[in-house]
Amino acid sequence: MAGPEIAENHRNDAYVYLYDIFPTLCEKVGIDTPSSVDGKSFAKLLDGEHGEKFRDELYLIFDNFVRGVKDDNYKLIEYRNGDKEEDKWTFLYDIKNDPWETVNLATDESYKDKVNEMRERILNHRDEWEEQAHPWGKDFWTRF
């Protein structure tokens, strides 16, 4: 982002969502964010502050066939494009050591616990966002 009172030539790798932009703009112009709005302001990040971590991870959703979670070290993607086993894929990447995501670790037995732990985090996000009440979410989770 660029504009008055926003630090220039500054990069920050904090995890933010698109829905965080509106609360950020509200804070920058000095108005309260309506209570009905999801998201949180990342104005301090725009000011160049590097204090506490903004978010520990991102919950990833694409349409009704992809769910995932990404943190500083790993990304787990669950892809469901149908009801048959051949339509279901799991991808685990060590993004610290493999930033281009070229080696899928999901089938490596030594990463089984990591896959299960990250799946549990996906389920927590699903419940937090009440995804099964939404048609796309319901469609994905019936195939999970």
Where on the chain are the PLM-derived regions?
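Generic low-polarity alpha-helical segments
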Residues: 1-2, 93, 125
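Short beta-strand or tight-loop elements
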Residues: 38, 55, 72-74
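Substrate-binding rim/cap in mid-to-C-terminal beta-strand-loop elements of soluble/periplasmic
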Residues: 1-36, 40-52
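Intrinsically disordered, low-complexity regulatory regions of eukaryotic regulatory proteins
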Residues: 36, 54, 96-99
